[in-house]
Amino acid sequence: MTRKDDIIKVLEDQARTKRENRLKSFKPYPKQIEFCNATADHSEVVLQAGNQLGKSEIGSYIATVFATGLYPDWWKGRRFDHPTRGWATGESTVAVRDVSQRKLCGPPGDEAQFGTGMIPKSLIVGKIIGHGAGGAFDTIKVKHTSGGISEISFKSYDQERSKWQGTTLDWLWCDEEPPMEHYLEGLARLVATDGLAYSTF
């Protein structure tokens, strides 16, 4: 290899590392930081804002730090020092795939882009394919700094409420406002852990 080839390889590796670890370079704006830090004192928090203002982005960021244990220096919000179980939820299976899953894992159905979402690719250790919408995941497994494995499952409001029953969770992320019966079912999943529900819509 020539020196030029070496430089090109280094630049390509740097670009790939940046692409596959968005968490490291993500810089929230003040209102997003305020939302994150509100999780310290409240069991339910909501961020309401207009379209394309970073609601889903910060929602995916919170899910990622909870799943990985990689909290930034500025973080004053809720902390989990153990692997977590959480749900990322939304209006429909397609909406969850195209928004929450995309923000967390990268573009759905494109294996070459898997791991370009908020969760560092190197920390995603498993995925369970869902039923229904092509490219949708049921669950992803993520390495936590404690050494254990966190799980993030994807749920939608168009599922029967019974699909929201029976599981104990540490956190619940509702991206878009949920129907009350689904939200209450989600809150019931948090009782045993004194968990957190956060919503972005």
Which residue ranges define each predicted feature?
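Phosphate/NTP-binding elements of NTP-utilizing enzymes
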Residues: 1-201
